[in-house]
From Swiss-Prot:
Mediates dimerization: annotated segments: 127-143
GO molecular function, one term: GTP binding
InterPro entries the record matches: HIV-1_Nef_core_sf, HIV_Nef
Function: Seems to play a role in optimizing the host cell environment for viral replication without causing cell death by apoptosis. Enhances virus infectivity and pathogenicity. Probably involved in viral immune evasion mechanisms.
Gene coding for it: nef
The protein's name: Protein Nef
Compartments, as annotated in UniProt: Host cell membrane
Membrane topology type: Lipid-anchor
Pfam entry (one): F-protein
Length: 229
């Protein structure tokens, strides 16, 4: 009886085996030429970055509290934050002075990207703006200066289409958790270093690119600005 039952089962296995071998083999095509180039380039960059990270000499001695400097080490030769993601810390383009056309182009770029208009002013954000202009556009950071307060702060660089406008916070905003502690709305920092008790926001004003009055206090000669610094 066992023999009789095993024959149908054996036939089923043979039929399944034949069915599998009759199935068409799947053909895999090659990547398009542009994709091949991108893939190889990315692979080369990853291999290079990995190799540099493995052979790079690190100063200091690792301890449970972190890496500590030893005798002869310099502070700027290493950083525990070097693997963090962010924009480049060194200029990627040749350095250049701010010009009228460059200031207008830079202003409209910031406006289109929505990265500055309506944002609370703070010293830290102003420094980030300087770093971005320096590293991505190659603009030397002697352009970012403002008229004295209180009131609206106008850019001293003719062509830069952003001004700092004081705003009044309503009661809900002042008590909101998002505006507590070190939030720029509560810190009330001022570009001239004097606390006028005002909350400032960047405001885009395209008329700053066409209205030039040398007699107004907020527009100064760039040579005089450079001498003061």
């Amino acid at each position: 009886m066992g023999l009789g039952n095993s024959k149908p089962q054996h036939k089923k296995q043979l039929s399944l085996w034949h069915a599998l071998h009759k199935t068409r083999a799947t053909r895999y095509g090659l990547l398009a030429d542009p994709l091949i180039g991108q893939s190889s380039t990315l692979q080369e960059e990853c291999d290079k970055a990995l190799k540099e990270s493995l052979i790079r000499k690190r100063n200091g001695k690792m301890t449970p509290e972190g890496r500590k400097l030893q005798e002869g080490d310099k502070w700027d030769e290493w950083s525990d934050e070097e693997d963090e993601v962010g924009f480049p810390v060194r200029p990627r383009v040749p350095l250049r002075q701010m010009t009228y056309k460059l200031a207008v182009d830079f202003s409209h770029f910031l406006k289109e990207k929505g990265g500055l208009d309506g944002i609370y002013y703070s010293d830290r954000r102003n420094q980030i703006l300087n770093l971005y202009a320096l590293n991505e556009w190659g603009i030397i950071d002697d352009w970012n200066a403002w008229s004295e307060g209180p009131g609206i702060r106008y850019p001293r660089c003719f062509g830069f289409c952003f001004k700092l406008v004081p705003v009044d916070l309503h009661e809900e905003a002042e008590t909101c958790e998002r505006h507590c502690l070190v939030h720029p709305a509560q810190v009330r920092e001022d570009p001239d270093g004097i606390n006028h008790g005002e909350v400032l926001v960047w405001k885009f004003d395209p008329m700053l690119a066409v209205q030039y009055d040398p007699n107004r206090k907020y527009l100064t000669d760039m040579h005089d600005l450079g001498k003061r610094k």
